[in-house]
Amino acid sequence: MDWEGVTFGAFLGVAGTFGMLALAFYPVMRRTFLLWNAVRTFAFCLMGLALFPVELPAFFPTGEARIDIGEIALSIAVGCTGPFLAAYIEERAPYARIRFWLRTMLPIGVLGGVATALAPWWPRLDWLHDLIILAMILGLLVALIVA
């Protein structure tokens, strides 16, 4: 056992616990941010499994496919952050535009995942994925500052 393994296990444990708690509380609270939180944490866990250099079962892809799975999961996780935060923002008129833009981040994140999946055939799409991630992070930052 080394510190990398301990840190990775702690990350998966904390992220998995948050995701499972969000799903457990959803039937009681009926708030959509709980579902978005569960999807986000699942995507972050998948990203961690795919990108961390740990031995995985034989059915899990290896090599470039494993890296692509991690990058697709990252795109989905960052894309789910927009609707997750939009569920928190009040539905008053001044914040309607911010909520709209936060909700559009999921399709943009899916587009980044598709760009990653197609990158083996069109290598320039890797750059598109990186630019999409950067744009989503900047959009989240601006939305948080304005809200």
Write out the residue ranges for each language-model feature.
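Individual alpha-helical transmembrane segments in multi-pass integral membrane proteins
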Residues: 1-113, 123-134
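Hydrophobic core of alpha-helical transmembrane segments in multi-pass integral membrane proteins
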Residues: 107-118, 137-144
